[in-house]
Structure formats: C-alpha cells, structure tokens
A protein has these predicted regions:
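Recognition helix of helix-turn-helix/homeodomain-like DNA-binding domains
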Residues: 25-40
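Short beta-strand-centered segments at strand-helix junctions
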Residues: 93-104
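Conserved hydrophobic/aromatic packing and binding residues within compact polymer-binding modules
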Residues: 6, 20-21, 31-34, 60
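DNA major-groove recognition helix of helix-turn-helix/homeodomain DNA-binding modules
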Residues: 44-59
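Short basic helix-loop element that most often maps to the first helix and adjoining turn
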Residues: 4-23
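DNA major-groove recognition helix of helix-turn-helix
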Residues: 35, 45, 61-64
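Short, charged recognition helix plus adjacent turn
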Residues: 63-90, 132-134
C-alpha cells in the first residue's frame, strides 16, 4: 500500500522522484527504493513525505483504495475523507458511518443542516458549526 500510495501521490502532485526527494532531504535513489518497496522510510521521513504530498501519515501508509468503502479512489487530501456508501431507507433516512460521526463529533440528538447544490450534491453540517461560521463572517 505505502509504495503504491507514494507513487500515485507523487505523480498527482506532478513531482519527479528527484523533486520529491529534495523536498524531504534524501537522494533520488533512496526515494526510488521507497517506491519499489526495497526499503521503507523512518517515521520522520514519512512525516515529511505526508506533508509534501498533503495527506495524513496514516493515509499515506495504510490507505487501500480497493478496501470496502473507498470506491477505488486514490488517497484523499489531508482533512478530506471517503466514508463509503450508505443506503437511503424507506423514509429517507441515512446512517452516518461511525468514523464520520467520530471525526465530526456528531452525537444522537445533534441538529444537522442539509445543504444542496443541484450541480454538486448534498452536504451535511452540524447546526452549531454552521452558526459559528456565519457569526465569524459578520
């Protein structure tokens, strides 16, 4: 997973091996070894790679685009998430995945606001978070 994620993220950002290697302070040959799986970076180099590629370290190392719920998508940018697919129930209800509820601090009884854009789709945001954003704009 790591080597595949590293290659796809490097290419997505348009970096050559030499350019990315320079950003993290290693030789092009060392980066090439990371990409072939011949060697693995230490934790500090992983942190530098994740920062340069604008992804979380966890996603850089562990993200599996073929895993259930990732829909075959590449590693999402840092702070962005793929939570998988949820079905709409008979009465229009959806279940928000546990990981999404944890990340966004959503609990039973919270008020959520649904926003829609006919060309983009539907978004969900906690009521208090939207109100805070609106207050800051005043």
């Amino acid at each position: 997973m790591f080597k595949d994620n590293l290659i796809s993220m490097r290419k997505m950002h348009g970096y050559s091996q030499a350019e990315l290697a320079e950003k993290i302070g290693v030789s092009r040959q060392t980066l090439s070894k990371y990409e072939t799986g011949e060697s693995l970076p230490d934790i500090e180099k992983c942190r530098l790679l994740a920062n340069a590629l604008e992804v979380s370290m966890d996603d850089l190392v562990n993200y599996d685009k073929e895993a259930n719920g990732n829909l075959g998508l590449e590693v999402p940018p840092k702070g962005k998430h793929v939570f998988g697919i949820t079905k709409v129930g008979d009465k229009g209800q959806i279940v928000i995945p546990a990981k999404a509820r944890k990340i966004f601090d959503i609990h039973p009884g919270d008020n959520l606001i649904l926003l829609g854009d006919e060309s983009q789709g539907i978004a969900v945001i906690k009521e208090d978070r939207l109100l805070d954003m609106l207050k800051r704009q005043e």
